[in-house]
Amino acid sequence: MRAQRHRCLTGRSALLLAGLLCAATADSAWFRTAEQQAADQFEDGEYSEAAEGFSDTYRRGVALYRAGRYTEAGNAFENVEREEVKADALYNLGNTRYKLSDFEGAVDAYEDSL
């Protein structure tokens, strides 16, 4: 009787564990941050959606640029504060200004990126 009860508990535990694992993988988006979800959207080519989820101004600018939202991308690149991407942001600012036919502004941004 005791062995049968042990097998029953082991079987129930295995079923419970399997159910929890399935639920966790099915709804793993629940456990991901907005930044992680935005990165997934960016990888899927959903650039406008990704831009809304990024809190980092550089990443937001890149997503907006890829979405063709050049004015907003330029604003994001102008507000980048992280030193490790500042030169890249200025270069990308030059690209956005070029796309907006602001050629003088593009040259200024390119020079500032050096």
Where is each model-derived feature located?
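Sec-dependent N-terminal signal peptides
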Residues: 9-18
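Alpha-helical protein-protein interaction scaffolds
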Residues: 29-114
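N-terminal signal peptide c-region/cleavage motif recognized by signal peptidases
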Residues: 21-26
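N-terminal secretory signal peptides that target proteins for export/translocation
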Residues: 1-9
